[in-house]
Amino acid sequence: KPNILWITVEDISPTLSMYGDSTAITPNLDKLASESLIYTESFTTVGVCSPSRSSLITGMYPVSIGTHQMRTGKDVFGWGSREYDGISNAIDVNGDSIPLHSVVTPPSVKCFTEYLRASGYYCTNNSKTDYQFAAPVTAWDENGNDAHWSNREANQPFFSVFNFDVTHESKMWLHRDKPLTVDPKKVPLPPYFPDTETVRNDVARNYSNIELLDQMVGKLILELKADNLFNNTYIFFF
């Protein structure tokens, strides 16, 4: 059985050289793209974070399973230190209590990794489970910042997810004190943005974060090659 590696990223749009925008220097992604099938006409089922992720993990439309409203789970970021009543004796894959207002999907709705695990795959998630519903403990063999295919049994096929959030919109401010690697004077600006120093710096930060992302992808591919797994692994980048 082949191995499967998902590399998921956030908030970059098609701002990559394989889609015609070479502002960010991304040698690792360029190399991967040159050896890959590139999708140029793809669509999302819903255009916001968690509802979209619920569709990816279940293979179902969010409106069909009640996960289309952002947000309906626990306060994952602790904004306002909200208090809520939990469902009695119910915890999610992270060991957290499940709030009463969480989406409860129909019993027939499964995380597709449950089927992969039943087929012998070692499934790891590093590390988001922000699905709008509580991920069941049966979804992953490993879940968290240390989850990795290297912990599987010898010769066991794996399905591994690495969610790199370095390009998440919030990181434009988190990394605001770090040096820019892309010149603000050279970034393309959409016509609906004012051409100001602040806007150019923000856009340059986004492109600089894409260059950081490229390094992370390169490191992951090197790990595959070091483990002699690269030639038997399907890699999805989206």
Which sequence ranges carry the predicted segments?
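Loop/turn elements at helix/coil->beta-strand transitions in domains of secreted/extracellular proteins
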Residues: 1-5, 35-40, 118-124, 155-159, ...
